[in-house]
From Swiss-Prot:
Compartment(s) where it occurs, according to its Swiss-Prot or TrEMBL record: Virion membrane
Glycan-modified residues: 171, 186, 247, 271
Membrane topology (UniProt): Single-pass membrane protein
Glycoprotein keyword on record: yes
Transmembrane feature ranges: 387-407
UniProt family annotation: Belongs to the IIV-6 337L family.
Keywords assigned by UniProt, alphabetized: Glycoprotein, Membrane, Transmembrane, Transmembrane helix, Virion
Name of the featured protein: Putative membrane protein 337L
One term under GO cellular component: virion membrane
Main location: virion
Amino acid sequence: MIIRNFPKQTNSLLPFELNPNKFPSYYGYPMYGYTGSYRNIEFPISQNGNFLQATSGNPPGRRVPEPIYSSGVQRSTRINYLPSSQSCAPFQSHADCDKSPNSKGGESYDWNYGWSSCCSGFCPSKRECAKPDPKECDIGNDILDRDPLLKIEWDVNAPNYRCTYDLHKINTSEQINLFVGKNGKNKSYDEIMTSFCEIPSHICPIDPGDGSLNDDKRGKEMEKCSRLISLDDEGTRCRAWAATQDNKTIDNIKEEYCLHNPNSPDCRCINRSSNSLYDEAKKNNPFPDGCWYKPCSTSVYLKTSDILSDEKHCPKEMCQVIYNVNQNNDVVIKDNTNNIKCDFTKFIPPTPGPNPGPTPGPNPGPIIPPINPLPLPNPTFLENKNVLITGIAVTGVAVLLFLLLMFKSKTT
């Protein structure tokens, strides 16, 4: 659905897209019905298409902004006049310019920028006066076509002026550029950037997931994120500015953003105390969250400076200690492992299986009775046998010799 009844502006401000019930807050104010989207910023819109203006004041918990000032020396005489108390007539005294509010809470004479001749120079001249001109303060309207200027007044005395702006109506890069062109990068510029960088963006990096098994957003672009990590020009601007600020300032921006955007994926580390699994794992855990809690060790998510510092001092034995403390706590060891930056499987002993009984050996086949070897002859018997054989041999040789002798004697 596209809103088409929005007051006509430059073409770059249209169209606005309606997103029903998508985001819970606008700069910390409750939102109702629909939101209008322009340049990936959400604004409250009623269901009939009219923009809802933020109420005055700040709801509970919302940081009260410092006034935003711009000052300079007026050159415009656009809102000019001649004092009505002086007429062009002889012997008239010079009437003063009227008075306008000043920055001290009082009034100062308007700027007497020249003189107007009376009676062709024969009567006393009249002062030419100019009031503070709001055009001197013009930095353009905001995303909802609202003028952020609250008032212009003389800065003590004319022609010095001071402008006061509504911080929540300065929310475009174009406004900031015009402000810097008039004032440079002063304290008010830092206040503007603080508020500007707390606005959500929808041009976001890939969500690495928080480690949950049912995290269906993992690997997809975040639907919403802080401008401190967004991928648009506003994100680039915020990161460049943040690099010039102290840790406390940037920590406050991150915490303020996550306070009013609790469902923003990049707040999973900062809003970790709202996760019951984190609370369970934190019990008896002496280690810094930046070491063991996965959302706080993921580079894409918002992290405060203490978490960033913790990541540099993580003990090597951390996972073993966490396991030892929680080894009987299934909520930590089994249900919460996806949030803890540890592989507990290396510490969990293997579960013993059922007793398998004796392992059967190979089939031995048919049983063959053993063959008993013949008994070795008695050594004494062998010795006697050898003597007998020797005796028989000697006797045989003697018989042969006798027979030979007998045969020889007969032949002779």
